[in-house]
Each structure stands twice: as C-alpha cells, then as structure tokens.
Amino acid sequence: MTLLTQSSTWQALSAHSKNVPHMRELFATDAARFNKMSLSACGLLLDYSKNKATAETLDLLFTLASNSQLEAKIKAMFAGEIINTTEKRAVLHTALRSTAEQSIIAEGQDIVPEVQQTLNKMQGFVSSVTSGQWKGYTGKAITDIVSIGIGGSFLGPKIVSQALRPYWNPELKCHFVANVDGTSISEKLKLLDPETTLFIMSSKSFGTQETLTNTLTAREWFLAKGGLQSDVAKHFVAVTSNIAKATDFGIDADNIFPMWDWVGGRYSLWSAIGLPIALLIGMDNFRALLSGAHQMDEHFANAPLTENMPVIMGLLSLWYGNFFNAQSHVVLTYDHYLRGLPAYFQQLDMESNGKSVTLNGTDVDYSTGPVIWGGEGTNGQHAYHQLLHQGTALIPADFIMPLQSHNPIGEHHDQLASNCFGQTQALMQGRTFDEALAELANSALSATEKQLIAKHKVMPGNKPSNTLLMDKLTPSTLGALIALYEHRTFVQGAIWDINSFDQWGVELGKDLGNDVLARIGATQDCDALDASSNALINLYRQGKI
C-alpha cells in the first residue's frame, strides 16, 4: 500500500463511503442543503448539493487535502517552483494571465515583462490584420485565418473561438487544422483564396510532425496558386521557440511569437497560441478572457480549502473515483456555444492525470484520472443519458449553463434550462418502484403487467452531479470556467502525488510513429517488429487487403 492509501483519513473515507444516505434523504432532512453546498466565485455559481456527500464527507476530504499538503503545493505552483519534476520545469500558465504589476520569477528572472511584451505584440498584430492594414501579396486585406497546430495548440484555440462566436469580427473567418490526415487540410484549402488567407503555424519546435506536414502542404498550395517564396512572409506567421527554422521557412522574424518551457501545451491558449482567438474576438475581449482566468487563479490561491471552488470540485471527483469505483466523468454543456468544452476538458484532465506512478516512481494502488466525456444538452438526453439514469456504473456529471442566452428566441432557453435542472433532479431522486407503479394505476395493463413494467421504470437515483451557472457566456466567464477545470485537475494530481504536467505516453506514440514511418518508406517489407505491426505495415505498403 502507498502512504496515501495507508493514511487514517483514506481508511476513514473508505469506511464512510459505505454509510452515506441516499440523496433523497439528505434533501428531505435538510432544507438548507443548497445554501450550505453552493458557492459563488468569479462570475460562476457552483451547486454541489446533489452529491453523495454529507458534512462528514467534506470534512474528511478537506482533511485528506490538508494532509496531502495541497495548500503548500498550490503555493509552489504559483511561486514558479519546479513542480514538473520529470522535465525539470516550472508550471506557470497562470503567469500568462497575471497583471502587469505582478512579479513572477522563473529560472531567476521576472517573466511578467516578457508576457506583457508578447501581449502588446499580439495587440499590434491583431490591429494590423483587423484594420486591413496587413495586406496579402496582391494588396488585398486578410479575410481568412488558418490555425495549424496539434493538441493544446489546436484544441484550446478552436474550442474557445467556438464558444465565443457571438464576439467574432464579422470580417474574419477562422479554420483549424490539426490532423495529419490529408483530407483535413485539403477540405479547408478548397474554401480559401491564397490572396486573402493568413496561416498561423503553432509548434514549439517548429518540427511537430503533424503541424509541420500541414504547414508545408499549405505553403505548397500557396506557391502553386501564384504566390512566390518572397510572398510567404505576408501569409505565414508562427508561434514557436525555434526562430531559425521559422525564418528558414520564409516567416519574417518580426512575425514570430514566443513560446516558453514553463507553459504546457494543454495550458497554452492564454499565450500567443491564442492568437487565432484574439484575431476573431479582438484584443480587448482576449484580455477579458485572461482576466476571468486570473480571477479564478486568485480565488484558487487565496480562498480557504472549504470555500475553494476548484478544490471542492477536485475532491468530489476524487471521492467517486477512489471510493465508488467511478471510471468516468461526464461534462454536459447546456449551451450550444460550449459544445466543444467536453473535448477540451477531456484533453486537459486525461493528459494531465492519466498517470500510474507517484512523483518518486512508486506504482499507485488507487485509480487516478477518469475518462472524461460528454456533449451538449439536450441532445444527450436522447442518447447516453439513459445509461446515466439506469446503467450499472456510477458516472458523476457536471451540468454547465448560462442563465441568459445570446439568442433569446421564444421559449427556447426556458425549455433548455428546464431540461438541465430536470436532469439533475432526476439523477438525484430517481423513481421508486411504488412511484412507478402508481403512475401505471390508470393504465389498461393487467396487474401482472403493471408489476413488470414498473420494475423497468425504476431509477435508483442517488447519481451525483454538480451544476455550474453563469449569468451569461462572456470572455470573462469562459476564462474563469476553463481556469476552474485547470485547477480542479491540479487538485486531484496533487493529492494522488502524480505529475500532472508531463505526458510521456504522448511522447512514446510520437517516437514509435516516426519509426513506423521510416519502415513504410523502406524498400523492403517490414519483418523487424511484432507480427501484427509487420503485417499492418506491409498491407499498407501494398495498398490493399
């Protein structure tokens, strides 16, 4: 057993988990439960009253957090200590949304001035493009942006841009390319005019396989359509640490934006990686996005554990994963603009906490990161919600909804909200056999049939959920929401004593992919790998099965 599972608090939580009353009873015996188990911060309201938790549960979870030195670990992250120990890096995505007045030291120097300089450079670039001052090689203004990246360099900008669609500049369109599948970029290029298209290449090394391949294809298309190599600088910019490679490609050094080792890819949308966002919504709105995240940073860093929104959400998720064998967590967004958030949170959580050894290399003997999945309401109610209500697995849920719609048409939003709240109520209370039987009382079914159908209509309830509300989806509230999930992820990793900031599984896939690529291009059939891999590679070389 690890020190964590040997601890008296862990053992107490394990025993306590078997004795928590049904939520129906918890609500019936405490009319003030919502008031006691809801919290407002940074433009968000968290209702966590529909959880399998009592005051004793929360006390034990907060004790577990304290005994795991959570507060000290939070301070260490914000202070720029080397908490990504396997890569010997600080973790300072929070510095990207700091104020100009702050001082944050990384590797012996204050990094805030460089962050502010980059924001100012972004401001000038965005102004140049959106005003029409930036011209393509034929003198036309830019109408289309193509963001080329992968992982955090792709998903963050895409999902945030999608979420903030009401704030877009109507004169610009943005297209996102990530997959190395040639179909992805080919379909995008069919829509574009090379004279008015600007490509943003985002890769720290300027060598990420998928990103470089897509960028080279974009340049070939640009040159084939009439552009010259000398025109590349008017249509390609880069976010990278490798200035030499970017300039060799044809990008003007003045149009290269920096990346830093102390920012992980899945936490990078707040940096120049967010340039596509800034172009679409403007720098004022981009700064509002940063400001909302900064407010959540301040809340996370300073609020006591018992009143700390990311801490509470992280602890409750851990509670279900480690003491109720919950293997997944569903995120349900009741706002069409937020439909991409489950995929973003999936990458954030699963890449961060999909680990199986502690910081000192000991194998864990407890579950770590769950599978994160989800979708938008009300679509899911006609699909996978069935499993949430009557399936055998316990799947905690997060419901996210703005109180006000950007498109208040008729009763649409009233119906959306009623479905959202109704789902949380149904998951909590369920339906008993007697209730199901009573509903069938006036039906034409026989007594035997009623008994049978009633059994099928029983729902156990006691299914946990959080509800997150905001007045309206704005850059600021979106920033706070994303930062909330970042810090929630950190909380769990800190208690599990794992490194939430490396991704060696991703790196292994890259290494083996490059090896396979070389074998695909070889002159002889492959026979050096396992039988399955040899066969698959050789079938691919033949081009038929």
UniProtKB/Swiss-Prot annotation:
<comment type="function">
    <text>Catalyzes the reversible isomerization of glucose-6-phosphate to fructose-6-phosphate.</text>
</comment>
<keyword id="KW-0413">Isomerase</keyword>
<protein>
    <recommendedName>
        <fullName>Glucose-6-phosphate isomerase</fullName>
        <ecNumber>5.3.1.9</ecNumber>
    </recommendedName>
</protein>
<dbReference type="GO" id="GO:0097367">
    <property type="term" value="F:carbohydrate derivative binding"/>
</dbReference>
<comment type="similarity">
    <text>Belongs to the GPI family.</text>
</comment>
<dbReference type="GO" id="GO:0006096">
    <property type="term" value="P:glycolytic process"/>
</dbReference>
<feature type="active site" description="Proton donor">
    <location>
        <position position="351"/>
    </location>
</feature>
<dbReference type="GO" id="GO:0004347">
    <property type="term" value="F:glucose-6-phosphate isomerase activity"/>
</dbReference>
<dbReference type="InterPro" id="IPR001672">
    <property type="entry name" value="G6P_Isomerase"/>
</dbReference>
<dbReference type="InterPro" id="IPR035476">
    <property type="entry name" value="SIS_PGI_1"/>
</dbReference>
<dbReference type="GO" id="GO:0006094">
    <property type="term" value="P:gluconeogenesis"/>
</dbReference>
<dbReference type="Pfam" id="PF00342">
    <property type="entry name" value="PGI"/>
</dbReference>
<keyword id="KW-0324">Glycolysis</keyword>
<feature type="active site">
    <location>
        <position position="510"/>
    </location>
</feature>
<dbReference type="InterPro" id="IPR035482">
    <property type="entry name" value="SIS_PGI_2"/>
</dbReference>
<dbReference type="GO" id="GO:0048029">
    <property type="term" value="F:monosaccharide binding"/>
</dbReference>
<dbReference type="GO" id="GO:0051156">
    <property type="term" value="P:glucose 6-phosphate metabolic process"/>
</dbReference>
<comment type="pathway">
    <text>Carbohydrate degradation; glycolysis; D-glyceraldehyde 3-phosphate and glycerone phosphate from D-glucose: step 2/4.</text>
</comment>
<dbReference type="InterPro" id="IPR023096">
    <property type="entry name" value="G6P_Isomerase_C"/>
</dbReference>
<dbReference type="InterPro" id="IPR046348">
    <property type="entry name" value="SIS_dom_sf"/>
</dbReference>
<feature type="active site">
    <location>
        <position position="382"/>
    </location>
</feature>
<keyword id="KW-0312">Gluconeogenesis</keyword>
<dbReference type="GO" id="GO:0005829">
    <property type="term" value="C:cytosol"/>
</dbReference>
<dbReference type="InterPro" id="IPR018189">
    <property type="entry name" value="Phosphoglucose_isomerase_CS"/>
</dbReference>
<comment type="pathway">
    <text>Carbohydrate biosynthesis; gluconeogenesis.</text>
</comment>
<keyword id="KW-0963">Cytoplasm</keyword>
